Amino acid sequence: MNTATGFIVLLVLATVIGCISADFQGSFEPYEEEDAERIFRRSTCTPTDQPCPYDESCCSGSCTYKANENGNQVKRCD
């Protein structure tokens, strides 16, 4: 085994040991349930002033009737 190969082996070994010790320290803990729900809701909810068929799909959690550009009343997220 020459010097370059030995250096590469030591580098890989140090990386593996570093990953294992980081895992033992809790660096890879999963999200709490509430955090996961908040992230999911943010990625799937309807933003403000967008049409909303259901109140629960809005990021704010509520819809109201508002006039659109044609003067018609449509439900939009608050």
Curated annotation (Swiss-Prot):
A GO molecular-function annotation: toxin activity
Any one cellular-component term (Gene Ontology): extracellular region
Domain of life, source organism: Eukaryota
Subcellular location as annotated: Secreted
Site, as annotated: Critical for insecticidal activity: 51, 68, 76
Main localization of the protein described in the UniProt heading: secreted
Tissue occurrence: Expressed by the venom gland.
Propeptide intervals in chain numbering: 23-40
Disulfide pattern: 45-59, 52-63, 58-77
Pfam families listed in its UniProt record: Omega-toxin
Single GO biological process annotation from the record: defense response
Signal peptide boundaries: 1-22
InterPro entries, A to Z: Omega-atracotox (IPR009415)
Domain comment as written in the entry: The presence of a 'disulfide through disulfide knot' structurally defines this protein as a knottin.
Family: Belongs to the neurotoxin 08 (Shiva) family. 01 (omega toxin) subfamily.
Remarks, miscellaneous: Several paralogs that code for the same precursor are shown in this entry, whereas other paralogs are shown in AC S0F1N4 and AC S0F1M8.
Protein's job: Inhibits insect, but not mammalian, voltage-gated calcium channels (Cav).
Name of the featured protein: Omega-hexatoxin-Hi1g
